[in-house]
Amino acid sequence: MASVELEQQVDDLTVSKVTPFVEKNIDELNSLVQLMFTPSAPDIHCTQKLSKSQNTKLIQYKIRLEKTRSRILVLIDNYITHEEKLSHFLGLLDRIDDILTTIKIMSGEDEELNFTLPPTTNNNNNNTTNVLESSSDSDYDIIQPREFLKKSKPNLILSTKNSLSSLLKRKKSKNQITTTTTTTTTTANNNNTRRNRNNNNNNNNNANGANRTIDTSSEDDDESISSSDDDIVIGSRRSRAATISYLPNVPRANPTPINGRTPTPSHNFEPFTINTFLNSVNGVNKTSTTSTTTTTTTTTTAAGRTNKTVNRNNNNNNNNNNNKRFEIESEEESETDISSEEEENNNNNNNNSNNNNNSNNNNNLKLKTKSMSFTKNGIPLKIRSRINSESESEPENQLAESYELGKCQRKHISTPSLRLSSAHLPNTTTTTTTTTTTTTTTTSPKSVNNNDDDESSDSDSSDSEIENIKQTIKKNNGPPSPMTTEIIIGYSGHSKRLCNRYSLPTVQKSFTKQQLHEEIINFGRTPSRIKQSFLKPVNGDAELVFEYDDSEEEEEEEEEEEGEESDSESSSGSEGEVIVESFGIEKKVLRQYIKLKKEMEDRKKVSTKLEEPVECKICYMEYDQSNEVFTLECDHVYCFDCITEHLRILITEGRVLDISCPHPQCKKEIKESEIYMLTNEKNWLKYQKFSMIASLKTEPIKWCPTPDCDTPVRGGSERNPILNCPKCSNDFCWICGEYSHEGAKCGTEAMELQGRKNKSIESAATAYIDFLESNKHFVKPCPTCKSHIEKHDGCNHMTCINCQHQFCWLCMNPYQSGHYSSNEYPECFDRQYYSPFVPDTYTPPPPRRRHRKLKMAKKITLYTAAFTVGAPLLLIGGAVLLCVKIHKHRKNRARRNRNVGLY
């Protein structure tokens, strides 16, 4: 019951809920992990430090994170074209993968997560210690927790490019490792075994039927012995499986003595890189601490036969390793090597001439692609990668560099770690072939060629081996087998599910930047179509190869790619590189898509003429050019003008939750990638804003009270009421919505403001109810969300702007196509534009023109009365004032004349 509730809770996670859910579970795990890392006795395991209830919680939180990870993959599929959300989801995947990997390492749940310690072998001891037994006899050293539980990206994986290059440079400068690759032929006397000579060079020269030439450098005997011992242990199946897996470098603690045995000192493995993987496949072990010489050889094995490869040992301790059999098949030569082998068998040339011919052939070799195939439990596995033709001397380093710099972009599917053992290869024929353009090691089942049984009986002779090589070359010249899968290193769960469910035909293409962008857009647009028509449920394997042609890439972009790759490698967990299981696009390709998405505006579509004209379902016009129409995921075709206008209307009205196909009988939603392609920048910004508002309606949020800030803030409670706006950095109260008043309750001013708000709300509610009662024929509630809708004129087909529900205004039933022409609704028949009858109780408002005339008449009457009464008064008053002025003037003049006469 709890699991069902958990699945329901995870399925209900939206874009805004997934991040807090992950943060909460990681915070809970933080306390448990800290307890597991507390110092204690060395014989106490990490899981024994927790109580029973704490262990139960640890398992529950782990299950939650695993289910949340699958939910995030679904969200990535939905938001494949959204840059910010996509980057955020990829970061969450990195954190979840790191914490799950750490928990598996500490609890020891997964067998592949256990690291084994290479035992030390004495010169006088003839028995080699079993790695599987030694791995279970001791505990690991307790490592202090790193900052993987913080919000920043963790640095758990050590196999980044910078650390790899620095490690290789340090080893080269200190140990001066030299590598010499030689290839010789196989005669009838040898037993297809690889042997190394002792420090005395005469042992190899005097050996009968010797067919391998190995150059070794003179170093200290003790150091060479220790390096050979490390090679033996790492060459075993157990250590090879641990070396191939994408796991962090975990040092091992010095265990206590068990059964009187001396504990093995601590030893650190070299972190996994592409070089390590290729060396493990080719049989090259670079874990020695002294200068050694590496030899790469080729062997041919018939059906039912096992190659016995003996590791290098300076003390001739080869007979003790017969129980640890494993196959190493590799080839780095051109087709001329095979011809040189035939000439040697016929002419009996010496080994020196053979080495000279091989060196000359290497100089003329121009490889374009390197492919290797291996088999685990009868399943063919294949890896392909690009190598530089100018660097034949170090193809493995070039392969690692090209892989790490993103030179070969591929769809990766997780498969189990390879264990190259003959025990897992019953009834198989392993043949190494070489061509001028491709070097491939193929593994074919026994049923492919019926003559393999006859040839295996005479496999000791060189003639039969040469014939096997020729037949295999002829078979390889044909089309590739569709039952091949691309080799991937990592966790085994996903590969098993994929191999049991799907089989994809081989798809191999080279893309430019523009073509890669279009392919990813197609993947994001039609994943369901791919799953229906491209994936077929059969018991087989799958290969989906996407090679990225970087011929147009500039050198200045390499640093950015290195930074992106280092982030992806450092954040990868037990699955290697995190993949998107829904449609098989890995994170590197997603980051490339984010980068190339910005170039979409400048991309010009090439117009091609269609075989048949296509009719638009909106304007019913026919179009014969491909750039004039657009096909939705539901296969409905519309012209660009109609579908663009349809999206513009929906976005402008805020109906972002109901953007679906315009066809009346189709309700399939239009994806964000299609909306982005069909809208301009202005409408796209509106769509994003309205989508955010629609998602925030379901969240417990508070809006910032700052006038110039419209930021929603989530969180807050009665105990912690203070919220901080991330935009304006102002604190406000979660309870009253006013500015922060920390240390005191909401004051009287806030309470008075709340009282005024309540009064205004009550008065507004009363007025609204009165309005509804008086206009009940023009205002009706939505049948779904009960939001009131007012209608005065127009069509009776209504759409609620709040919930996007479509209904009939007359009968209030859900609207369907042909509603007003159906006999099921007789009251609505042929009444699509019918207006209801308005009763006599309704009094329409008076016309506005009449009111204006009355006001104008009043003004004219008032002005006329004022002028009639005021004009006489003004005339009389003016005459009186004039008479008074004249009288004063005469009186003053008479006074002046009288005064002049007196004097």
Swiss-Prot record:
A zinc finger (RING-type) spans 616-666, 782-811. Residues 120-130, 178-216, 287-301, 311-323, 346-364, 428-443 have a biased composition (Low complexity). Residues 415-427 have a biased composition (Polar residues). PROSITE patterns: TRIAD (PS51873), ZF_RING_1 (PS00518), ZF_RING_2 (PS50089). One of its GO terms (biological process) is protein ubiquitination. Its EC number is 2.3.2.31. Zn(2+) 6 binds at C808, C811, H819, C828. It catalyses: [E2 ubiquitin-conjugating enzyme]-S-ubiquitinyl-L-cysteine + [acceptor protein]-L-lysine = [E2 ubiquitin-conjugating enzyme]-L-cysteine + [acceptor protein]-N(6)-ubiquitinyl-L-lysine. Pathway: Protein modification; protein ubiquitination. Residues 313-352, 542-569 form a coiled coil. Zn(2+) 5 binds at C782, C785, C800, C803. The active site is at C795. Zn(2+) 2 binds at C634, H636, C661, C666. E3 ubiquitin-protein ligase. This is E3 ubiquitin-protein ligase DDB_G0292642. It comes from Dictyostelium discoideum.
